[in-house]
């Protein structure tokens, strides 16, 4: 079974990867994105990910069975305080909350806990109801989840009306090629 990603994640991943391919001289700009899409669609990219996982000492079976990944012992939900539209999700603040859980580093030598983190369950522009879960928090303890929840409360905003449509995912190429 091939991994299926949200369309927007696929789009930005291909755009960023195409820049690397072009920069390395592996393909001209006119072909890079379509070659990468073919690698994703054929499963070749997933095969390469399995190989890289194994060569870095990981278990390549997790690619096909994510249940083998470490699990956080405490899972909680961040519910909407009211009804409305998700008008903002501050990625920077979500990132700080993730570091607070141990999913990121404060300093280069810090360990990263692969079992903790967030599942963001809604998108900007989505209509939500009061108490609907917006984010699922995977933490080592109830206290850690509470600290993350405090940060998430300032990261997610709701409004009574839908936000303006977002612009394109890729605004422009800086590489200049």
Q: What are these model-derived regions, one by one?
A:
Residues 1-177:
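Well-ordered secondary-structure scaffolds
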């Amino acid at each position: 079974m091939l991994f299926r990603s949200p369309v927007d994640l696929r789009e930005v991943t291909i755009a960023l990867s195409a820049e690397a391919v072009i920069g390395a001289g592996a393909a001209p700009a006119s072909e890079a994105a379509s070659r990468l899409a073919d690698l994703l669609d054929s499963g070749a990219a997933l095969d390469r990910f399995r190989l890289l996982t194994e060569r870095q000492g990981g278990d390549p079976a997790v690619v096909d069975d994510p249940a083998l990944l470490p699990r956080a012992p405490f899972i909680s939900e961040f519910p909407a305080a009211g009804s409305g539209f998700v008008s903002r999700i501050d990625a920077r603040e979500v990132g700080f909350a993730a570091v607070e859980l141990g999913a990121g580093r404060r300093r280069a030598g810090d360990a990263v806990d692969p079992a903790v983190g967030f599942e963001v369950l809604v998108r900007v522009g989505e209509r939500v109801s009061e108490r609907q879960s917006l984010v699922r928090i995977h933490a080592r303890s109830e206290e850690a989840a509470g600290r993350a929840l405090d940060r998430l409360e300032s990261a997610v905003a709701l409004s009574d009306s839908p936000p303006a449509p977002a612009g394109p995912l890729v605004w422009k190429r800086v590489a200049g090629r």
